[in-house]
């Protein structure tokens, strides 16, 4: 590209960023993405890396969608737990009336401090969300789920009565109100969404999300989460293999993906990710079924190494920081590392 065109392009890019905000346009190959964005870990090291900035951005709208039992709520609860570790306040708008406090506690959520609302209709849910955001005192608000945000008119109407586009209009209006307040108060709002099938689609993907198109436009990050397999110990099923694709990302280059394990009753297995990424970045040596770290054998087979890292928290933390340094992410100094019971 000649010099004049380069100058014109640079001026246009600067004008776009000035008018629409940092991250509204970028080169796909850029690695030096916005470093001043405040983020919260997703609870998955691989997903934090794939997001490019080390986690989910604050002051933005996030959409997490996928099929049933794919790990949508687990991922949001992990994000809540990470926010609480940093001293933040979290709210859960349970429109599905399906939150399991015991499971949330097992994942690491401080349920005593978690704000929860079970609204009667979609308008009430979104009004509560807006009031919490405007207060400036809540750091993350989760809405579970968009599909359950039933408009008041539909609840009060007759069963079977056609209600065309009510939910889409409700979402569009609410997001217009929410966006400016979210940015001003630096609150993260996570919408969980479900998948539906479009009728009559022959070519292309028939899947779509509920609630119209507004959320697709307003979301800074959209995550597509899927269950890809099962984790077994002998004959017993102990968890799911999960893949998250970053469908949209306005704070870093999109279209990356992360694979991790979700263990029943535990949530995302950070130890499994440390093993996989440690081997990938040559921090952990793998010879046959044996794994070694700093020349010392730490276990035979992934399950045994996972147990070793659970017992030796400081070693797991040390490897994690080395992985973060290798990929250019900030160290998680705020993460509390309990004293290791196995040392």
From Swiss-Prot:
Keywords: ATP-binding, Cytoplasm, DNA damage, DNA recombination, DNA repair, DNA-binding, Nucleotide-binding, SOS response. GO terms for cellular component: cytosol. The keyword Nucleotide-binding applies. It holds the Pfam family RecA_C. It comes from the Bacteria. ATP binds at residues 66-73. One of its GO terms (biological process) is SOS response. One of its GO terms (molecular function) is damaged DNA binding. Can catalyze the hydrolysis of ATP in the presence of single-stranded DNA, the ATP-dependent uptake of single-stranded DNA by duplex DNA, and the ATP-dependent hybridization of homologous single-stranded DNAs. It interacts with LexA causing its activation and leading to its autocatalytic cleavage. Belongs to the RecA family. PANTHER family: MITOCHONDRIAL DNA REPAIR PROTEIN RECA HOMOLOG-RELATED (PTHR45900:SF1), RECA (PTHR45900). This is Protein RecA. It comes from Nitrosomonas europaea (strain ATCC 19718 / CIP 103999 / KCTC 2705 / NBRC 14298).
């Amino acid at each position: 590209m000649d010099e004049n065109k380069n100058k014109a392009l640079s001026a246009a890019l600067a004008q776009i960023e000035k008018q629409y905000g940092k991250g509204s346009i970028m080169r796909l190959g850029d690695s030096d993405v916005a470093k001043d964005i405040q983020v919260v870990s997703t609870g998955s090291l691989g997903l934090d890396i794939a997001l490019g900035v080390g986690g989910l951005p604050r002051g933005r709208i996030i959409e997490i969608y996928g099929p049933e039992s794919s790990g949508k709520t687990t991922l949001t609860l992990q994000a809540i737990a990470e926010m609480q570790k940093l001293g933040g306040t979290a709210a859960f708008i349970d429109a599905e009336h399906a939150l399991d406090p015991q499971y949330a506690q097992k994942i690491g959520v401080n349920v005593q401090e978690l704000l929860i609302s079970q609204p009667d209709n979609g308008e009430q849910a979104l009004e509560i969300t807006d009031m919490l955001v405007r207060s400036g005192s809540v750091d993350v608000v989760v809405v579970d789920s968009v599909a359950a945000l039933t408009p008041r008119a539909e609840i009060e109407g007759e069963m079977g009565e056609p209600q065309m586009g009510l939910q889409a209009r409700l979402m569009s209006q609410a997001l217009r109100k929410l966006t400016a307040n979210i940015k001003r108060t630096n609150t993260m709002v996570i919408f969980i969404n479900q998948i539906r099938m479009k009728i009559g689609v022959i070519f292309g993907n028939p899947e779509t999300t509920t609630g119209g198109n507004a959320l697709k436009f307003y979301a800074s990050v959209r995550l597509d989460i899927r269950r890809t397999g099962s984790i077994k110990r002998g004959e017993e099923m102990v968890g799911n293999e999960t893949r998250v694709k970053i469908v949209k990302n306005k704070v870093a280059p999109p279209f990356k993906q992360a694979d991790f394990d979700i263990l029943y009753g535990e949530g995302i297995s950070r130890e499994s990710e440390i093993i996989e990424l440690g081997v990938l970045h040559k921090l952990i040596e793998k010879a046959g079924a044996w794994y070694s770290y700093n020349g010392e054998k730490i276990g035979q087979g992934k399950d045994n190494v996972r147990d070793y890292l659970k017992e030796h928290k400081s070693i797991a933390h040390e490897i994690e920081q080395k992985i973060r340094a290798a990929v250019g992410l900030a160290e998680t100094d705020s993460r509390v590392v309990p004293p290791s019971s196995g040392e």
